[in-house]
Design a protein with these regions (language model features):
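Gram-negative host-targeted secretion-system effectors, predominantly Type III and Type IV
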Residues: 1-140
Length: 140
Protein backbone atom coordinates (compact mmCIF):
# COMPACT_ATOMS: atom_id res chain seq x y z
CA UNK A 1 0.00 0.00 0.00
CA UNK A 2 0.84 3.67 -0.05
CA UNK A 3 2.99 5.17 2.68
CA UNK A 4 0.82 6.91 5.28
CA UNK A 5 -2.17 4.62 4.77
CA UNK A 6 -3.54 3.08 7.97
CA UNK A 7 -2.27 -0.48 8.38
CA UNK A 8 -4.94 -2.94 7.30
CA UNK A 9 -5.20 -6.68 6.99
CA UNK A 10 -4.31 -7.73 3.46
CA UNK A 11 -7.53 -7.92 1.47
CA UNK A 12 -7.08 -11.65 0.93
CA UNK A 13 -7.16 -12.40 4.69
CA UNK A 14 -10.83 -11.42 4.71
CA UNK A 15 -11.91 -14.71 6.27
CA UNK A 16 -10.56 -17.62 8.30
CA UNK A 17 -10.08 -19.89 5.29
CA UNK A 18 -6.99 -17.76 4.52
CA UNK A 19 -3.75 -18.96 6.19
CA UNK A 20 -2.90 -15.30 6.99
CA UNK A 21 -6.02 -14.94 9.19
CA UNK A 22 -5.63 -15.20 12.98
CA UNK A 23 -8.41 -17.82 13.14
CA UNK A 24 -7.18 -20.06 10.33
CA UNK A 25 -5.86 -22.87 12.54
CA UNK A 26 -9.04 -23.14 14.64
CA UNK A 27 -11.21 -22.87 11.51
CA UNK A 28 -9.26 -25.57 9.66
CA UNK A 29 -9.42 -27.93 12.65
CA UNK A 30 -13.16 -27.32 13.21
CA UNK A 31 -13.87 -27.82 9.50
CA UNK A 32 -11.92 -31.09 9.38
CA UNK A 33 -13.81 -32.48 12.39
CA UNK A 34 -17.18 -31.38 10.96
CA UNK A 35 -16.35 -33.11 7.65
CA UNK A 36 -15.46 -36.31 9.55
CA UNK A 37 -18.85 -36.20 11.31
CA UNK A 38 -20.60 -36.34 7.94
CA UNK A 39 -24.43 -36.36 8.11
CA UNK A 40 -24.29 -36.49 11.94
CA UNK A 41 -23.25 -32.82 11.90
CA UNK A 42 -26.71 -31.94 10.55
CA UNK A 43 -25.19 -29.50 8.04
CA UNK A 44 -26.74 -29.44 4.60
CA UNK A 45 -24.22 -27.61 2.41
CA UNK A 46 -20.58 -26.60 2.05
CA UNK A 47 -21.55 -23.05 3.01
CA UNK A 48 -23.26 -24.23 6.22
CA UNK A 49 -20.15 -26.30 7.01
CA UNK A 50 -17.83 -23.30 6.51
CA UNK A 51 -20.14 -20.99 8.50
CA UNK A 52 -20.34 -23.49 11.37
CA UNK A 53 -16.57 -24.05 11.37
CA UNK A 54 -16.14 -20.26 11.61
CA UNK A 55 -18.62 -20.01 14.49
CA UNK A 56 -16.89 -22.88 16.33
CA UNK A 57 -13.49 -21.23 15.81
CA UNK A 58 -14.85 -17.94 17.17
CA UNK A 59 -16.39 -19.58 20.25
CA UNK A 60 -13.17 -21.55 20.87
CA UNK A 61 -11.11 -18.34 20.60
CA UNK A 62 -13.42 -16.57 23.08
CA UNK A 63 -13.07 -19.54 25.46
CA UNK A 64 -9.28 -19.14 25.36
CA UNK A 65 -8.69 -22.36 23.42
CA UNK A 66 -5.63 -22.64 21.17
CA UNK A 67 -6.76 -25.70 19.20
CA UNK A 68 -9.80 -27.86 18.48
CA UNK A 69 -9.10 -31.56 19.02
CA UNK A 70 -12.70 -32.79 18.70
CA UNK A 71 -16.11 -31.55 17.57
CA UNK A 72 -19.08 -33.41 19.05
CA UNK A 73 -22.82 -32.98 18.78
CA UNK A 74 -24.89 -32.47 21.92
CA UNK A 75 -27.36 -35.21 22.86
CA UNK A 76 -30.27 -33.37 21.21
CA UNK A 77 -28.22 -32.66 18.07
CA UNK A 78 -28.92 -28.93 18.27
CA UNK A 79 -25.62 -27.96 19.89
CA UNK A 80 -22.08 -28.57 18.66
CA UNK A 81 -19.11 -28.55 21.02
CA UNK A 82 -15.49 -27.76 20.18
CA UNK A 83 -13.17 -29.60 22.57
CA UNK A 84 -9.50 -29.00 23.35
CA UNK A 85 -7.79 -31.90 25.09
CA UNK A 86 -8.69 -35.52 25.74
CA UNK A 87 -12.41 -36.37 25.78
CA UNK A 88 -13.54 -37.11 29.33
CA UNK A 89 -10.46 -35.48 30.88
CA UNK A 90 -11.60 -33.02 33.57
CA UNK A 91 -8.98 -30.55 32.28
CA UNK A 92 -10.41 -30.47 28.77
CA UNK A 93 -11.69 -27.11 27.54
CA UNK A 94 -14.80 -26.73 25.45
CA UNK A 95 -16.99 -24.18 23.79
CA UNK A 96 -20.47 -24.54 22.33
CA UNK A 97 -22.51 -23.17 19.43
CA UNK A 98 -26.15 -23.72 18.47
CA UNK A 99 -25.94 -25.58 15.17
CA UNK A 100 -28.74 -23.71 13.36
CA UNK A 101 -27.47 -20.26 14.37
CA UNK A 102 -23.87 -21.22 13.57
CA UNK A 103 -24.83 -22.52 10.11
CA UNK A 104 -26.47 -19.15 9.33
CA UNK A 105 -23.62 -16.95 10.67
CA UNK A 106 -21.67 -15.71 7.61
CA UNK A 107 -18.00 -16.77 7.69
CA UNK A 108 -16.90 -13.18 7.00
CA UNK A 109 -18.76 -12.00 10.10
CA UNK A 110 -17.27 -14.61 12.47
CA UNK A 111 -13.86 -13.97 10.85
CA UNK A 112 -14.05 -10.23 11.61
CA UNK A 113 -15.17 -10.91 15.19
CA UNK A 114 -12.35 -13.41 15.73
CA UNK A 115 -9.73 -11.02 14.31
CA UNK A 116 -10.99 -8.27 16.65
CA UNK A 117 -10.99 -10.69 19.59
CA UNK A 118 -7.44 -11.85 18.76
CA UNK A 119 -6.06 -8.31 18.49
CA UNK A 120 -7.73 -7.14 21.73
CA UNK A 121 -6.28 -10.20 23.47
CA UNK A 122 -2.78 -9.25 22.19
CA UNK A 123 -3.28 -5.72 23.54
CA UNK A 124 -4.33 -7.08 26.96
CA UNK A 125 -1.28 -9.37 27.08
CA UNK A 126 1.02 -6.50 26.12
CA UNK A 127 -0.43 -4.22 28.83
CA UNK A 128 -0.13 -6.97 31.47
CA UNK A 129 3.53 -7.42 30.52
CA UNK A 130 4.08 -3.63 30.75
CA UNK A 131 2.44 -3.55 34.22
CA UNK A 132 4.57 -6.44 35.43
CA UNK A 133 7.61 -4.59 34.13
CA UNK A 134 6.66 -1.41 35.99
CA UNK A 135 5.95 -3.28 39.22
CA UNK A 136 9.24 -5.16 39.24
CA UNK A 137 11.52 -3.82 42.00
CA UNK A 138 14.54 -2.05 40.58
CA UNK A 139 17.85 -3.35 41.88
CA UNK A 140 20.63 -0.87 42.58
Amino acid sequence: GEVGEPAQLPERARDMSDPAHAGNRLFTEARGHLQQMGPQSGLRSQQELDNTAGALALSAQKAGMSRIDHVVAGTDGRALFAVQGVMGDPAMQRSMVQREAAAQLPLEQSSQQLAAEASSRQEQTASVIREQDQNRPRSL
